[in-house]
């Protein structure tokens, strides 16, 4: 998978400034995962957010236009090859239908929104090795009957 040029530029500027996505939360008032999605063009910024981000990264104002354009959703091959991303694919391959069944038992026939959605990543200390804790929260949308 090739990383878009704008993504490479944004990531390099962030690295050059010694910033993390968590550092940018205070500047933009958005979650670190949402900000990372901006970098990868999976989300778009408001004009004000784009100005703040470009300023924080020390980039030319010409990047504002790119950050406010409609995003391109979905990046990379259908079956991901990056090991970390592949684990999520594998998790859904193994647990996707079981998760679906449990959601339907609790909510009924419908889906979890990825639009009215938040995702948090936390680090949990564990004596056997640090753990990754991911919390997804999406609005339940029942299927309409007509």
From Swiss-Prot:
Its EC number is 4.2.1.104. Disulfide bonds: none annotated. Pfam families: Cyanate_lyase. The active site is at residues 87, 90, 113. Keywords: Lyase. Gene3D superfamilies: Cyanate lyase, C-terminal domain, lambda repressor-like DNA-binding domains. It catalyses: cyanate + hydrogencarbonate + 3 H(+) = NH4(+) + 2 CO2. SMART domains: Cyanate_lyase (SM01116). The keyword ATP-binding does not apply. Catalyzes the reaction of cyanate with bicarbonate to produce ammonia and carbon dioxide. This is Cyanate hydratase. It comes from Nostoc sp. (strain PCC 7120 / SAG 25.82 / UTEX 2576).
């Amino acid at each position: 998978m090739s990383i878009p040029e704008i993504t490479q530029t944004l990531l390099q500027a962030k690295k050059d400034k010694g910033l993390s996505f968590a550092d940018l939360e205070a500047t933009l008032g958005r979650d670190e995962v949402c900000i990372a999605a901006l970098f990868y063009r999976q989300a778009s910024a408001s004009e004000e957010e784009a100005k703040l981000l470009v300023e924080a990264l020390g980039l030319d104002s010409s990047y504002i236009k790119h950050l406010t354009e409609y995003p391109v959703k979905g990046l990379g091959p259908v079956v991901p090859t990056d090991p970390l991303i592949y684990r999520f694919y594998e998790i859904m391959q193994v647990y996707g239908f079981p998760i679906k069944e449990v959601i339907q038992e609790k909510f009924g026939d419908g889906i979890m929104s990825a639009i009215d959605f938040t995702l948090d990543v936390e680090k949990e200390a564990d004596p056997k090795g640090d753990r990754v804790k991911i919390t997804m929260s999406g609005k339940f949308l029942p299927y309409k009957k007509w």
